[in-house]
């Protein structure tokens, strides 16, 4: 049986029993590995070293900062089950993604900052209704997540500009240009 000794100081159990104070006083770091029949039996620790170890353990048990994570990150949301068609189905007008859609999208590698807007969902449903393809509910959600990712990134995350808005020229002259 192999074992790892965590201190360079090793002593037999008989030597420790005979004169424990001298053995511990000579110990480097206040710890001695005690062997019995050429096998490690236990560690002998000085009171000062034990106090250091207990203080270190107490320090490590306390949180390193006062920042606490939201419990919501650790708990699965308990939502009422929604009647989702079993198996594959074609897109229908009242289809909705799950309540925890943003969390699921993150699991699929799509980071969404805000939930699906009614306009985005309506556009997605209208497109896929016309296509007439059939997928499982989870696949529809994955398609919606990818669609949102691509749609929102196409304009650098900014909302689409209204094409009917008349632009107004800037009247300021940049530094370095003559006016």
Swiss-Prot record:
Belongs to the DnaT family. Involved in the restart of stalled replication forks, which reloads the replicative helicase on sites other than the origin of replication. Can function in multiple replication restart pathways. Displaces ssDNA from a PriB-ssDNA complex. Probably forms a spiral filament on ssDNA. This is Replication restart protein DnaT. Keywords: DNA replication, DNA-binding, Primosome. One of its GO terms (biological process) is DNA replication, synthesis of primer. Homooligomerizes. Interacts with PriB. Component of the replication restart primosome. Primosome assembly occurs via a 'hand-off' mechanism. PriA binds to replication forks, subsequently PriB then DnaT bind; DnaT then displaces ssDNA to generate the helicase loading substrate. It comes from Escherichia coli O6:H1 (strain CFT073 / ATCC 700928 / UPEC). Residues 156-179 are annotated as: Disordered. It comes from the Bacteria.
């Amino acid at each position: 049986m192999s074992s790892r000794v965590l201190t360079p100081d090793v002593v037999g159990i008989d030597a420790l029993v005979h004169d424990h104070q001298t053995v511990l006083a000579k110990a480097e770091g206040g710890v001695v590995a005690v062997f019995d029949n050429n096998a490690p039996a236990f560690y002998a620790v000085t009171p000062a070293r034990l106090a250091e170890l207990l203080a270190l353990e107490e320090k490590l048990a306390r949180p390193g900062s006062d920042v606490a994570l939201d419990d919501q990150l650790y708990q699965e949301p308990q939502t009422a089950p929604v009647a989702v068609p079993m198996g594959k189905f074609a897109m229908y007008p009242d289809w909705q993604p799950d309540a925890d859609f943003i969390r699921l999208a993150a699991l699929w590698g799509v980071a969404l900052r805000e939930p699906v807007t009614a306009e985005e969902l309506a556009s997605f449903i209208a497109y896929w209704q016309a296509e007439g393809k059939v997928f499982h509910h989870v696949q529809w959600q994955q398609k919606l997540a990818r669609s949102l990712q691509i749609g929102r990134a196409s304009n650098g995350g900014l909302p689409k500009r209204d094409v009917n808005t008349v632009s107004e020229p800037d009247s300021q002259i940049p530094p370095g240009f003559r006016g």
